[in-house]
């Protein structure tokens, strides 16, 4: 029983570590605008799949970690991720029962709103510029959502994480 518990938490943590690595991985300059929001995708999956284990607290801690890694103002990503994941966690039953293609469309919207909120918070704190390329990254996240969802669901079921 203890081994399964450790394996389950190791699985969740390893997905977040992989998401951080993918977020930090360098992309060619021409494709930088297509970079998906890996951390948001992984966090969104876990909030939809097991909202009783991964929810607002995890979102806040991951946001703080992301702020520390990026060197941005401490709490910006934590605030935006925790508030947006709160809304998603409140509506997880509705969102979970939507078709995968409709979830992809909502992921585009969620990622764009999260990036816009991060911009607005940073703009209120100091000078920040909004890049229209954030829209393309949101579309890339939406295109990747079905594959991310299916892969993570397969691994979650194999580990018997519910």
UniProtKB/Swiss-Prot annotation:
Q: Which Pfam families match?
A: MreD
Q: Where primarily located?
A: membrane
- GO cellular component annotations of the record: plasma membrane
Which of UniProt's keywords are assigned here?
A: Cell inner membrane, Cell membrane, Cell shape, Membrane, Transmembrane, Transmembrane helix
Q: Which domain of life is it from?
A: Bacteria
Q: Specify the protein's topology with respect to the membrane.
A: Multi-pass membrane protein
Q: Which GO terms describe its biological process?
A: regulation of cell shape
Membrane-spanning ranges:
5-25, 30-50, 56-76, 105-125, 132-152
Q: Where in the cell is it found?
A: Cell inner membrane
Task: Please give the NCBIfam families that the UniProt record associates with this protein.
Answer: shape_MreD
Function of the molecule: Involved in formation of the rod shape of the cell. May also contribute to regulation of formation of penicillin-binding proteins.
Family in the record: Belongs to the MreD family.
Name of the molecule in the record:
Rod shape-determining protein MreD
Q: Which organism is it from?
A: Haemophilus influenzae (strain ATCC 51907 / DSM 11121 / KW20 / Rd)
């Amino acid at each position: 029983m203890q081994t399964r518990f450790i394996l389950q938490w190791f699985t969740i943590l390893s997905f977040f570590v992989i998401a951080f690595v993918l977020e930090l991985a360098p992309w060619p300059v021409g494709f930088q605008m297509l970079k998906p929001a890996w951390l948001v995708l992984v966090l969104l999956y876990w909030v939809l799949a097991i909202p009783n284990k991964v929810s607002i607290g995890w979102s806040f801690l991951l946001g703080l970690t992301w702020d520390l890694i990026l060197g941005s103002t401490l709490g910006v990503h934590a605030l935006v991720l925790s508030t947006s994941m709160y809304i998603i966690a409140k509506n997880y039953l509705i969102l979970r029962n939507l078709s995968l293609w409709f979830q992809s469309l909502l992921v585009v919207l969620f990622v764009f709103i999260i990036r816009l909120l991060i911009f607005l918070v940073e703009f209120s704190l100091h000078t920040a510029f909004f890049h229209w390329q954030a829209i393309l990254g949101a579309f890339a996240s939406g295109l990747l959502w079905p594959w991310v969802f299916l892969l993570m669901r397969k691994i979650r079921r194999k580990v018997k994480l519910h």
